[in-house]
Amino acid sequence: MLLRDLVPRHGCCWPSLLLHCALHPLWGLVQVTHAEPQKSCSKVTDSCQHICQCRPPPPLPPPPPPPPPPRLLSAPAPNSTSCPAEDSWWSGLVIIVAVVCASLVFLTVLVIICYKAIKRKPLRKDENGTSVAEYPMSSSQSHKGVDVNAAVV
């Protein structure tokens, strides 16, 4: 079925062209679905014999053997029916004591830091309204009115 057979010689070709484009894939689908698979070489012509060779594919090689089990580095333990030895309670006690001691040290350091922070003198207001920290060295020098950069003779 060719396009020139469908196109009329004297009229518009669009309807027939659209019909051809719509039906051509369907025609190919019908031909593929009605085809029969080849079952033997007796139905094959000489031109096809060279292409298909009608031989069964060679068998697949056997799968490789499974790997051997891993070797144990130590001698295998004898199968015993006795209960496993109970863990000593000392190891658990040592861990608990270590955690408690570490917690006490942490809390002691925290209390010391908080005590020093509370004991520190609060900020005082300077004459011009800015906040100045009172440290022991700076407060004694600032009230004397001595210039820090002045040389002592």
UniProtKB/Swiss-Prot annotation:
Signal peptide: 1-35
Transmembrane annotation, as ranges: 93-113
Cytoplasmic compartment residues: 114-153
Top-rank taxon, per record: Eukaryota
Effect on the protein upon substituting C114S: No effect on ACHE tetramer recruitment to membrane rafts
Xref: Pfam families: PRIMA1 (PF16101)
Effect of S131A: No effect on ACHE tetramer recruitment to membrane rafts
Protein keywords: Cell junction, Cell membrane, Disulfide bond, Glycoprotein, Membrane, Neurotransmitter degradation, Signal, Synapse, Transmembrane, Transmembrane helix
Span of domain PRAD: 56-70
Residues carrying sugar: N79
Membrane topology according to the record: Single-pass type I membrane protein
Gene Ontology cellular component list: anchoring junction; plasma membrane; synapse
GO biological process, alphabetically ordered: establishment of localization in cell
Region (Disordered): 59-79, 129-153
Alphabetized GO MF terms: enzyme binding; protein-membrane adaptor activity
Tissue expression notes: Predominantly expressed in the central nervous system, including in the brain. Also expressed in muscle, heart and kidney. Isoform 1 may be predominant in the cortex and striatum, while isoform 2 is more abundant in the cerebellum.
Extracellular side: 36-92
InterPro entries from the UniProt entry: PRIMA1
Its biological purpose: Required to anchor acetylcholinesterase (ACHE) to the basal lamina of the neuromuscular junction and to the membrane of neuronal synapses in brain. Also able to organize ACHE into tetramers.
Assembly: Interacts with ACHE, probably through disulfide bonds.
Protein name as annotated: Proline-rich membrane anchor 1
Provenance organism: Mus musculus
